[in-house]
């Protein structure tokens, strides 16, 4: 005699693990795109210091020399760089009324939208930001193999490069993959002092040479990513539009339609690119 066994569906959903975005720690939103799809930033030149021409009794014989005692009188240059938003992305899906009822309400528009943002939208935005930052970094030494013996010295070299470029010493962040962080924890020089819960809640796992250490999943970073030391002033990461809607009463379906649109981008500022040091691995 055959027996048909019962299959029970649990009233929970097996969602994917997805890390929270850390981009806000590494970038800024100092510029306003309201009413425009692009903005232009001025880059103003400077002039060198001269030896003041004191006690001069005759006009200079060299006609190329300025009559001014302060030095040659030249105009400052004012060039621009354009920041044009390139990513205008969208999604749409339907939650059928019968499907919602017959899945014990697990297929529900509100939670489905939150899942879409967490598992699809945020990872894409993050990946774009990290790609832009590594591509536009002002310091990019040759790719090298990182080990527990050299990782600490390599990071100190990055810190020195930013110091020599006169990048502010505060608010720096060190971006590492889980693999790089594992090497760092094995380095004898690493300070294993535990940090507070408040900093961990923000995504900071340690502090090294004054920089907050931020661990980012490898899937959101370029291939061969070793580590990146950054100051947030170097990268602008605007999100001009975030438009997400749940439409219950529509003639297009017997159910709930969820739509979303996000317009975003990231830019490394030309005069501040020295605030990013990117080390690739072999």
Task: Walk through the language-model features, giving the residues of each.
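Intrinsically disordered or highly flexible coil/loop and linker segments, enriched in small
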Residues: 15, 50, 126-130, 168-171, ...
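Residues immediately flanking
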Residues: 44, 97, 178
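P-loop NTPase signaling cores
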Residues: 59, 65-66
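Long, hydrophobic/aromatic-enriched structural stretches that serve as scaffold segments
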Residues: 71-109
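Alpha-helical scaffold segments that mediate packing/assembly in large oligomeric complexes
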Residues: 97-165, 277-282
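Extended, solvent-exposed, turn-rich assembly/linker loops in the middle of proteins
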Residues: 135-205
């Amino acid at each position: 005699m055959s027996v048909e066994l019962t299959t029970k569906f649990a009233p929970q959903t097996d969602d994917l693990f997805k890390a929270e975005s850390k981009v806000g720690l590494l970038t800024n939103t100092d510029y306003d795109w309201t009413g425009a799809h692009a903005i232009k930033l001025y880059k103003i030149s400077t002039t060198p210091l001269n030896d003041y021409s004191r006690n001069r009794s005759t006009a200079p014989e060299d006609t190329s020399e300025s009559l001014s005692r302060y030095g040659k009188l030249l105009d400052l240059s004012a060039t621009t760089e354009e920041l044009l938003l390139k990513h205008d992305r969208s999604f749409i899906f339907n939650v059928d009324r019968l499907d919602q009822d017959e899945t014990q309400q697990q297929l529900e528009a509100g939670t489905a939208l939150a899942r879409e943002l967490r598992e699809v939208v945020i990872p894409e935005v993050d990946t774009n930001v990290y790609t832009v930052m590594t591509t536009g970094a002002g310091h990019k030494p040759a790719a090298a193999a990182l080990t527990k013996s050299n990782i600490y010295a390599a990071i100190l070299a990055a810190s020195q490069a930013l110091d020599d470029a006169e990048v502010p010493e505060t608010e720096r962040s060190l971006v590492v993959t889980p693999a790089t962080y594992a090497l760092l924890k094995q380095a004898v020089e690493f300070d294993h002092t535990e940090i507070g819960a408040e900093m961990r809640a923000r995504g900071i796992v340690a502090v090294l040479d004054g920089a907050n250490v931020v661990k980012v999943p490898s899937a959101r970073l370029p291939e061969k990513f070793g580590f990146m030391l950054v100051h947030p002033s170097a990268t602008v990461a605007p999100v001009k539009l975030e438009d997400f809607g749940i439409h219950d009463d529509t003639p297009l379906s017997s159910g709930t339609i969820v739509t979303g649109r996000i317009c975003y981008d990231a830019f490394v500022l030309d005069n501040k690119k020295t605030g990013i040091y990117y080390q690739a691995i072999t």
